[in-house]
A protein has these predicted regions:
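Interfacial helix-start motif at the membrane-water boundary
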Residues: 35-55
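Membrane-interface interhelical loops and short amphipathic "cap" helices
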Residues: 26-39, 95-97
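Non-cytosolic membrane-interface motifs at loop->transmembrane helix junctions
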Residues: 34, 95-108, 155-164
């Protein structure tokens, strides 16, 4: 049952995200998820709800399975608050207050979710090789994404790569059997 609870939300969110991204050009600024959302508000809200749900479900399953800490709970509340801000405030530069609240929410969601996933893997770093690999992969993706964001600003690809990586890595650790070592 855990496998379905983990993978189904990730698959649904990933498919919806790919479909949603077809409204823009993924490698250009006008293909940013928030930019698409200016014209397609309802679709943007659905994307946000599916994304935060898939990530929260998988982060919760992983933390409960592999750690004893409950520190992820306030982090998920902060992350979800960021997503709510992202969805409630327009990405419209002419409406400065809304624009800045939207950007702050997006940053809070992205940073806190990325940190929460990274900390999960880091806490388990010494347990198994898969956690070592995923810790390094997560760090590289988050740092690389940050650098690309500074260089190219927001694009659909820059926004979705860390999210899709999270879907994949979290689903992998949540669905693996307890006795299997993937990189062993």
């Amino acid at each position: 049952m855990r496998k379905y609870i983990s993978t189904v939300p990730c698959i649904v969110a990933a498919i919806y995200t790919v479909w949603y991204m077809h409204f823009g050009t993924a490698y250009k600024n006008e293909g940013a998820l928030s930019t698409i959302g200016l014209e397609r508000r309802g679709y943007f809200v659905i994307w946000g709800v599916l994304t935060i749900a898939a990530l929260c479900i998988n982060i919760t399953l992983a933390y409960k399975r592999y750690t004893k800490t409950k520190a992820y709970i306030p982090l998920l509340v902060i992350s979800a608050t960021g997503m709510i801000m992202t969805l409630c405030f327009d990405f419209d530069f002419d409406e400065k207050v809304q624009y800045y609240l939207h950007c702050a929410g997006s940053l809070i969601f992205s940073a806190v979710t990325g940190i929460t996933v990274f900390v999960l893997f880091l806490l388990n770093f010494k347990k198994e090789k898969i956690f070592k690999a995923f810790t390094v992969i997560t760090a590289v993706i988050l740092l690389g994404d940050f650098v690309l964001l500074l260089i190219y600003q927001e694009t659909g690809l820059i926004e979705t790569v860390p999210i899709f990586a999270g879907y994949i890595m979290l689903a992998v650790i949540n669905t693996r059997s307890d006795k299997v070592e993937i990189f062993g």
